[in-house]
Amino acid sequence: KNSKTLNILSSSPRRIYNLQNFLPKYLPFKLDNINFQNIRGNIPTRINKFLDNDFDAIVIAKAAIDRLINNSFEEYRNLSFEIKKNIEKCLWMVTPLSENPTSPGQGALGIETKKENNDLNSKIASITSQIDIKCVNLERDILKNYGGGCHQKIGVSFFETSAGLIHSEKGQTEDGVNFSEWEIYNHKKIKDKKVSNDIIFP
């Protein structure tokens, strides 16, 4: 929409804070104003609210959409088809983690079991990613420094690349202090000299 005002649906203070600064720099037209409106409900409900009303955009976690459309269970087939069909009606932008880090631990699933259930624990261990556990723990440790809480304007992402773990951190404290960090957390020795910047910084 070639308009100077955008009306965007989002329920996340973190996303609202980041997008207020991100969108004016990266959209191909000048923005005079961005209005954010709160939205509730599951993913299909949110998408339908967006399509059925006069809004310019909606912000949704890519991890949530990926899980729904890639679900192989028969009972989710129609839902997956519906979401794909609605996505095709829209133009989509996947914002870079360097500018819009995720909520700490976003996309990770936690499973609580009894210690004595060895069979179940063994099966869970076989599908557990140790690097993901490390990244989630690092993200949560940083969030604790800010007091924690999902209503804060704080994004923290750690993810693995051929150069090592990348650390992206951005947001605003409860005292109104802005912060931003983008770094290689721990370096790996790169054997292939032809490794591209896209691999190091996806």
Model-derived segments and their meaning:
Residues 2-16:
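Short loop->beta-strand "edge-of-pocket" segments that line small-molecule binding or catalytic clefts
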Residues 16, 21, 25-202:
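Small-molecule-sensing regulatory modules
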